[in-house]
């Protein structure tokens, strides 16, 4: 398969290099189109008010001065002279669990691929970030990715589906298997951090994500915590169907009291 690989950690991040190498070793034709620097948290942002520069690093790699969404959009709408078969985004250097997916550039790169008609997978390694911990097990996440891509080739998903994959940071031998999960969610984010710069101006840092809230059995949080690879099928229909009836009552009342033109 012809695989387009992107990420949000940047073109030089170890995760994307290990992922691209693993896919090539599995027999796939791989093109990397990724941001020129870390663009974590960029979500689905698309650059519309300035031109975007793309630099070809080698025959199989482009560095783009833009967001993860920019990278995939450019790759699929003119940068490449062929059409890839699938988009794989990652390997992110931390998890994208629960409502993390709203902000994730890793997930958004995959989402853009799906918007433009391709199967798409986002792969994240849920690193533990403990002092003295061994190096992140990117090879484990890459091994999971190539197995998932193989399944997608033989048994495709519906056209509106993205796979959000979160891999525990352990060796492959320590892994307990795959689990299909739903997204959990977190409590409200921690407060922003306030500091004073050398000129006496107040500056702010976004605070850390909130702790787990909905993280019980069946969620992505629970699977990873129990050393399973979490696979969550997601899609981008944001309609809250359960609220349609209630909001319809509102609009009926509003319509009845408005002097609409005939």
From Swiss-Prot:
Enzyme's top EC category: hydrolase
EC code(s) of this entry: 3.1.3.5
Cell compartments where the protein resides: Cytoplasm
The keyword Nucleotidyltransferase is annotated on this UniProt entry: no
Family annotation (Pfam families): SurE
The keyword Cytoplasm is annotated on this UniProt entry: yes
The record's free-text note on cofactor binding: Binds 1 divalent metal cation per subunit.
Keywords from the named record: Cytoplasm, Hydrolase, Metal-binding, Nucleotide-binding
Organism of this sequence: Xylella fastidiosa (strain Temecula1 / ATCC 700964)
Family, similarity comment: Belongs to the SurE nucleotidase family.
Protein's name in the database: 5'-nucleotidase SurE
InterPro entries with a match to the protein in the record: SurE, SurE-like_Pase/nucleotidase, SurE-like_sf
Required co-factors: a divalent metal cation
């Amino acid at each position: 398969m012809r695989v387009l690989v992107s990420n949000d950690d940047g073109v030089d991040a170890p995760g994307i290099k290990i992922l691209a190498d693993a896919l090539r070793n599995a027999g796939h034709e791989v093109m990397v189109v990724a941001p020129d620097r870390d663009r974590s948290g960029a979500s689905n942002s698309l650059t519309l008010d300035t031109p975007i520069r793309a630099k070809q690093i080698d025959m199989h790699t482009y560095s783009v001065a833009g967001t993860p969404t920019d990278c995939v959009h450019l790759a699929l709408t003119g940068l490449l002279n062929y059409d890839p078969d699938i988009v794989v985004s990652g390997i992110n250097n931390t998890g994208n669990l629960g409502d993390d997916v709203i902000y994730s550039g890793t997930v958004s790169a995959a989402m853009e691929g799906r918007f433009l008609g391709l199967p798409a997978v986002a792969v994240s390694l849920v690193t533990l970030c403990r002092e003295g911990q061994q190096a992140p097990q990117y090879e484990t996440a890459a091994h999971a990715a190539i197995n998932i891509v193989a399944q997608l080739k033989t048994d495709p998903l519906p056209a509106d589906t993205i796979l959000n994959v979160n891999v525990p940071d352990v060796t492959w031998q320590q892994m307990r298997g795959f689990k299909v999960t739903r997204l959990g969610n977190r409590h409200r984010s921690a407060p922003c951090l306030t500091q004073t710069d050398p000129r006496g101006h107040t500056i702010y840092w976004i605070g850390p994500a909130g702790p787990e809230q909905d993280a019980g059995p069946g969620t992505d949080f629970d699977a990873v915590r129990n050393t399973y690879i979490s696979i969550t099928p997601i899609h981008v229909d944001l309609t809250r169907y359960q609220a349609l009836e209630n909001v319809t009552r509102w609009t009926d009342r509003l319509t009845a009291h408005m002097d609409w033109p005939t």
